[in-house]
Every structure is written in structure tokens, then in C-alpha cells.
Amino acid sequence: MTNSKLTETLTFECETGNYHTFCPISCVAWLYQKIEDSFFLVIGTKTCGYFLQNALGVMIFAEPRYAMAELEEADISAQLNDYKELKRLCLQIKQDRNPSVIVWIGTCTTEIIKMDLEGMAPRLEAEIQTPIVVARANGLDYAFTQGEDTVLAAMVQRCPSNAPEQNQIEKKSLVLFGSLPTNVATQLNLELERCGIQVAGWLPSQRYADLPVLNQNVYVCGINPFLSRTATTLMRRRKCKLISAPFPIGPDGTRAWLEKICSVFNVAPINLIERERLIWDSLEDYITLLRGKSVFFMGDNLLEISLARFLVRCGMIVYEIGIPYLDKRFQSAELQLLEKTCSEMNVAMPRIVEKPDNYNQIQRIRELQPDLAITGMAHANPLEARGINTKWSVEFTFAQIHGFTNARDILELVTRPLRRNKALENLGWNQLVKM
């Protein structure tokens, strides 16, 4: 199915709203835990430091593997030598932590004052003998999840192009890209092994030294919808072949993801239909609550289309999918599956609104009165005060939502506000009293 065909059936609109989202430097929260021998140095202002301290909620006693290089007036007015200051900090990090890699995270301020991080990093790397990766995960991006996309795209440049002689990879190998908790990554590895496909590596890997081999013989497949920059870098810089598949979110998405990979490797998938059916049967208690209910996505983290497709399959009606940014090429398989799912469930195709204007969205929510709005944190309380059930979209970013077994976690999050309000109604607490 071509993109032109999709455009005829799915309605795409673009508004001129602001990007109401977290700052992308929040990607440090999960990446420093995923890459176990790394150290993340965020180069920014006090505001960035306050944000990380509050958003990550890590006490100083925990000694996390990230820090702030705080820019002061002397830095911004070029009275201090940036190179000397960064060298001092990196030497201190090396002495205290001895990481295998230091990741410099550029912020809005470094972008505005034109700090040449890419120019300084190779010189400093040669001097201190520790790899330094530069990623500009600043707030000028569309969504906060794209911070991870920027870091992984920078990591691609550091992956080896050939395997050591003693560990030659197969002629046709598979590398998956996207940061997942170790247990979820293991589950997806096992699902592919059941189909007879061995995963050659992950980007990012748990250890910097274990970064996967990337060359023209490697097939790559993403596990998150917000990794389009990484996918482009893999294809253009390392000549990898991208497998365009739906994302493994929900039983239907996981099955389609596995089937697409199997088709590329000429492998017949084993018992996938039966396995998906068993998962759906186990979710029936949640689906009963959702069937016939409506949902409205305001747009925040680029997971909206995958989540909407899964909720349509659960029997929900999706009025609108707001999304900060849509790469139609990278998400083409997901869009096709959304269209197919709506057709099979006999429901109307949802509107997809790119860069939505929140003022217009509030009017549409007021008219449509959905049973649930999935929204950023800024809009949750005002909508609740107007009688609309809400769920924070950021929770889906930090929850384990990939693979067959984690579909229950998605439905647990989606149904929680509905179950809470039902419990309050049973108690007779369904009216707000103005004091």
C-alpha cells in the first residue's frame, strides 16, 4: 500500500500549535541506566539542572551516573575557555567514575551561544583517552522522546563496521535499535529466537564495548516510533537495511513486528496467531471495561499512533490522534496497520493532527466529550476539573509497554482513571463541591 493510498483514507491535518512537551534532556533518565558503563554530562544552565533534579527525582546520595556542567555568565560572554573547563570536568569524571564513554548532552543554551562541542570532543577524547559522544538533545526538538533518538544517532558513528575475526557475524544479521529495560529486551530476543532468528545486537547496548557491528549486511529494525533520525543515520552513514515494521506495542503490533522480520529473513513464524489469541484472552477483563469507550490523544511523546491502533483493537473509539511530529516514511507500516485495524473493527478512521493547537483541541474535547483524554501533564488537571478523565502520556514512556506480555501494563494504565471514577461513583462521590 503506498503513502498516497494512505492519505486518501487516513485524514492528516497540520495545525500551528506550540510544542507542549517535556525537555528532551530527560532522556538521560533512562539512558544512563541502560548503558551501564556510561556517564552523561549535561551542559546547560541552572534551569536544566532544576529540571533534571525534579524530573528524575534522584537523591544525591544515590550518586547517579550523570551530572550538570552549569554554564555561568562568564561562559556565555566567552570570558572563560570552554575547552579547559570541560577538560577539568571530564578528568574529574574519569578519576571518580572511570566510565567507558562520556556522553555530552547539549542544551538550548549551547545551541544559542554556538558552543562547538563537536569540535572540542575529538581533541579532548585524544587527550584523556576516553570516548566522548556529543548529542544535542535540546528543547528545540518536537518531543522529549527525541532526546533518545539524538543520542542513538550519535552512537551509530561509534559502532564497529567489521566484527573481529574470531567472532564473524552471519552474512545477514539483525540489529534492533531503541532503549528498553533489560528484561523487556530479553523477552523480544526470546520471541525472535522462537521464530529461529538470532539478534546480533542492540543499540544501545548495556556496555559501550558491546556496540553492534553495523554495515551493508546488517538489517535494522526499530522498536519505538520516535527513532526516525537514528533510522536515517543507520541507512545513510552505515548502509544498513531498514525493516519497516509496525512497532511491538500490544499483541497485534508485536505479532505484526515479528511477522515482518520473519518475512525479511525468509523464516516461517511459529504459533504467532495462537500466541496472540492467548494474550487477548488474558486481557478480556480489561477489554470489557474499554469496549465502546472513546479516547482523545492530545499529543506528547510520538507513541500516539501505536497506542491508538492498540486501543482500537481493544474496542475503543479514537476521536483524534494529536502528535507533535509525524515521519510518515518511518511510521508507514504503523499507519497501514492502524488503517487495517479500523477497517476490521468497523470504526471510523481517527483524525491525525500534527503539531496540534491546544486551544483548538480543548474546544474539540468539549464538543466530543471523550471518556478519556491522554495528555501531557500541563493539561491534565484543567481537563479533570471540566469532567474529562485524563491519563498522563509521559507514563507510557516510562512503563514497560513492548512485547506480548506487557500489553497488560498498557491496559492497566488506560483503565486506571476509568476504574477510579467508577469506584468514586459507587461511593456517591461524583460531584465537585465548591468550598
Swiss-Prot record:
Subcellular localization, as worded in the UniProt entry: Plastid, Chloroplast
Chain positions recorded as [4Fe-4S] cluster binding sites: C23, C48, C108
Record-linked InterPro entries: LIPOR_BchN/ChlN, Nase/OxRdtase_comp1, Protochl_reductN
Keyword Nucleotide-binding applies: yes
Family from the record: Belongs to the BchN/ChlN family.
Catalyzed chemical reaction(s): chlorophyllide a + oxidized 2[4Fe-4S]-[ferredoxin] + 2 ADP + 2 phosphate = protochlorophyllide a + reduced 2[4Fe-4S]-[ferredoxin] + 2 ATP + 2 H2O
Protein name per its UniProtKB record: Light-independent protochlorophyllide reductase subunit N
Pathway annotation: Porphyrin-containing compound metabolism; chlorophyll biosynthesis (light-independent)
One GO-annotated biological process of the protein: photosynthesis, dark reaction
Record's keyword annotation contains Membrane: no
Pfam families: Oxidored_nitro
UniProt function note: Component of the dark-operative protochlorophyllide reductase (DPOR) that uses Mg-ATP and reduced ferredoxin to reduce ring D of protochlorophyllide (Pchlide) to form chlorophyllide a (Chlide). This reaction is light-independent. The NB-protein (ChlN-ChlB) is the catalytic component of the complex.
GO cellular component, as recorded: chloroplast
Main location: plastid
Enzyme class: oxidoreductase
GO molecular function, one term: 4 iron, 4 sulfur cluster binding
Cofactor: [4Fe-4S] cluster
Keyword terms, alphabetized: 4Fe-4S, ATP-binding, Chlorophyll biosynthesis, Chloroplast, Iron, Iron-sulfur, Metal-binding, Nucleotide-binding, Oxidoreductase, Photosynthesis, Plastid
E.C. number: 1.3.7.7
Record note on quaternary structure: Protochlorophyllide reductase is composed of three subunits; ChlL, ChlN and ChlB. Forms a heterotetramer of two ChlB and two ChlN subunits.
Cofactor binding comment, as recorded: Binds 1 [4Fe-4S] cluster per heterodimer. The cluster is bound at the heterodimer interface by residues from both subunits.
